[in-house]
Amino acid sequence: MDSPPECMLALSCEPPLSPPSMPSLDHSPQFLPQSPQSTPSSPQTELYAPVSPCPLPEASLQDEEEEDEELSTPPSPTPAVALFPGELELGSPSSESSPPATPLAPFPSFGALEKAISSGQSTTCNDELDLQLFNNESIAVTGGTSSGPGLRFPCHVCGKRFRFQSILSLHARAHSLDRERRASAPYRTTHSKLQQNHESNSMIQNPLSGSFQKSMNEDMVPEEPLQTASSPQFLFEGTTALTPPLTEEAPISTSFSPLGHAQLEDNTPSPAAPAFRCHACKGKFRTASELARHVRILHNPYKCTMCPFSASQEERLAAHLQESHPPEDPPAEAVFPSGAIKAPPETPVPQMSVIPAFRCETCGQRFTQSWFLKGHMRKHKDSLDHKCQVCGRGFKEPWFLKNHMKVHLNKLGLKAGLGNLGPPGADQSKGPASSQVLGALYSNLLLARSMAGGGGSGSRTERSDASAGSSKSSILGYLGLPKDSSNGSCMERLQAVAQVAEMGNGGGRGGDSADGADQAAMWQLVARSLVAAQHNQQQQQQQRSHSLHQHPSSRATVAGEAKNMRAYLGGLGSREELDGSSAPWECPDCGKLFRSLQQVVAHAHVHVQKTQKGQSARGGMSREEDIINRVSGTQATGGAGQRTGENESRQEGKQLPSGVGASGSFHSVISHLSGQNGLRGSSPSSSSPRERVRGTGMKDCPYCGKAFRSSHHLKVHLRVHTGERPYKCPHCDYAGTQSGSLKYHLQRHHREQRNAMATSPNSPSPSLPSLTGSPREGAKKRRLPSMSQQSSFGRVPGEAPSSRHTQSWTIGLSEKKEGSSASAHHREGDLESQYRGLSGMMGALLPSGLEQSWIGEVTLPKVPKVSRRKPQITSRMVSANGFQDKMTSQEGGFEPLDLSRRPLQDEGGVSQSGSGPSSGSKGGNDILNQCVFCPFRTSSVELMAMHLQVNHTSKSRRKRGAPISSNNHSQKLARPDRDPLALWKFLGVEDGVASPEDWVSARAENGVSPENRETEDNLELASGAMGSFRSRKKKPQMSEHVDEEDEEIDEEENDLEANGSFANVPQNQSRRAQSVSSDLPDDDLPKEEEGVLGE
């Protein structure tokens, strides 16, 4: 420990004559007797008195004070404040009344106490606290009063003063906890016992001297023991409780207790007490009281009033009170006075809380406000709290509903309002047709209710009284609309009738020109409900007649009848009562099942209108009415048997809606209702939906309400709701709603199948069975696939095109020419197959000499701009003779590049008929097609076409080649059009070539041989063909033009290497082929080649 050298010097001196006294460890107020050695004339109080009578120099005393100030910070500025009035008088007197204590040597055993205190190692705080922040500038000299302007925040409870407001707030929390504990009865009763127990437990456990323990017991105040508890943060376990001073005015006590000479002699070897160090903030203090006060105020501000325990945090003090001082459980009147103690959160509230009225239907959570529930429902994906009063659809947001209502307003003409929905009056003819429909339907619904209840056993008065409450539910049951779950008015719900009346009617903008077919469909719906109600009423009367003797007073109300009616109607009932298996309505055309009749009527728009002959046969009846009549007639036949039979079990399930009577009564009800309400029925002159949409009217979808400008777009859109897919793929199970989707499917997945089948003469072509026709035509083609395909694409093998050079190759242009005949497609495909065979033979026979004779016959047209869109057909078209094309048409241009390698359809590369040699060699499953004019080979038709365009056209040769002047070029002979087949036969017989198959077998080895062998074979074949040609023509070789030909060959090779056409061909092969072609006589050159060379 750090001890000043002056203390060591003082301990080495002789002890004083007078017995020294020990300074008090706590600064609690106490009465201090004056020492006989102290004189009032002493100028100041010395902190350390010399042990021997040898006086120390004044300079040494000053140096000692300066070093002490450097070792430790000044004492804490917070002096003790008296808790009780009168304690100040009991404490040490002021500096004027009592002289300062005589400076004596410190108690020798005080060093042992310091060693015991400093032996503990604190681990709660490692940072050093700056005690200068709490320095009091006006601190008085030891022994005087300590009050100054630094302590500006006094405590109103105990009177302590603090320099900062934060420290005062921490101090005030301890008072608030004490006040709450004192208010309880267990605190008053057990305070004395706990005080005695803690006094006995807080004794010094370490052995100290008897006189020191005695002096501490004398100094303790019995009224209010204020002791610093041993806390985990400040390790004072097993040491004397240090209580800081509680009075602000009282100075720091420096009293000493008398000691005996024996105790002094025993403790003389102990060194002097150094400065006291705080284990939490590493601060040093001169006395233990200052250290205890420092710990009490800064580190442990929360002190327990029932024991010496103190804590640095309020939560630890509260936990200590719950563990060490739990309150007893006396009666509630004594322990818990009114308003003093708050009820814990676990205790139930005395008054019963009202259950929130707004409950979430999805999760069951309840809310007190409606907007809370609305905000909560947004969490659920299926929350559709904004309901449409017309059609019953739900939306998540209000603006969605607002936009949806525009559909009904435009369709029903409700912008001006429809307030008069009663029976039709005198001025009803002036209004729009939708208003007439609404009024007529409303009146007929009331009539239906009267007819349904006409045979009932109840009186007319009772039925009229009960009709007011059940009108809305019965009307909804007739119309097949959902029940009203949002308390909407019946006027709003009746507007939904117009959705049935205006199906496919462009919003009623046509005025009096309403479609009779749509009105007939609406009346069929209402009449079917009426007949079903009558049938249900008759069955109920029969049941009542059997049970009348048992229950004579039992009567069924109108509401009960309406409920039974809705359950009986099934498909026309509410949507909530429908299940997925109930589908009683069947479309007579396609056989699809629907839940209600209005869905069948909406589905009728999908099918194309029948021909005029069929309409005249039916007497001009519209298709919708015919569908309804067929459905009604089909289901009425089953209903007649039900009405006469006694089996009641057949009235359930899908057959329940079919019990509507015969077709005669069905149409009689329609005519009766239509004539009574002044609405005209369907007439032969009524316009069809297609003719109606020709104007400016809009077509609305009856399912979702979307508007379309034409019936075609509506027809395509309705397929989404009805599931109609008329365009089916002939190769797989795919079916599309539009022709474009089937085109894309065939182009993407079935190109090779379509191409292979389109070019085969014996098999019908499946390409585009229903692309140019209507859905009805597509259905006919599906029913008779063989007949339609043979008539459209079938071609007899004996057919030959009239003009081979004038036909166009329409590969890639089929989307632009959907209306062209299918036979032209096949003839064009056959043309290109013939050209492939002939071009292969000419390429094998005449490598370069007679190339322009072939091009002269089939002139290359100007290539139009080819679209970058992927064409419909991009693969090779293999004809009957097994040859492939390398040329473009006059209209279609070149086919887009397709570098994919596809397997050959006919293995071997040559068909069975085998009219000529193949244009390439088979390598694996791919055919390497060789160019007619050069040794270039490729398996892609597109790449070969591009090669021909870049390298073997007059324009490309004009750019590459230099003009060749020759004396023999002056005489030009106009050659007539040669037939390549005749030329082949003529040369083949003279040269010893047996057949084209032998020639193919001789060249088939080129595609799989090594490069050197391939080059040699090509050279031998070319030289052999050239030698035979020379022997036949007997023309000498032109040797004087060898230099010019070499220059042309070099220039052409450089150009071709730049274009990348000869990437896979050796240079010597290209040079030899060009040299062979240059040795041909001038007579054999065509007109076009002669013109190019003449330039």
From Swiss-Prot:
Pfam families: zf-C2H2. GO terms for cellular component: nucleus. C2H2-type zinc-finger domains 6 and 9 are important for binding to the GGGGG motif in target DNA, and for the interaction with sox9a. The keyword Transcription applies. Signal peptide: none annotated. Residues 1-107, 320-343, 453-472, 532-560, 630-698, 743-810, 866-924, 951-976, 1003-1095 are annotated as: Disordered. It comes from Danio rerio. Residues 23-44, 85-99, 534-554, 908-920 have a biased composition (Low complexity). Interacts with sox9a. Gene3D superfamilies: Classic Zinc Finger. Residues 665-680, 872-891, 1061-1076 have a biased composition (Polar residues). Residues 61-71, 1042-1056 have a biased composition (Acidic residues). Its main location: nucleus. One of its GO terms (molecular function) is RNA polymerase II cis-regulatory region sequence-specific DNA binding. The gene is znf219. SMART domains: ZnF_C2H2 (SM00355). Keywords: Activator, DNA-binding, Metal-binding, Nucleus, Repeat, Transcription, Transcription regulation, Zinc, Zinc-finger. This is Zinc finger protein 219. Disruption phenotype: Morpholino knockdown of the protein results in a curved body axis. Expression of col2a1a and sncgb in the developing notochord at 24 hours post-fertilization is significantly reduced. Transcriptional regulator. Recognizes and binds to the core DNA sequence motif 5'-GGGGG-3'. Binds to the col2a1a promoter and activates col2a1a expression. Binds to the sncgb promoter and activates sncgb expression, as part of a complex with sox9a. GO terms for biological process: notochord development; regulation of DNA-templated transcription. Highly expressed in heart and brain. Also detected at lower levels in muscle and testis.
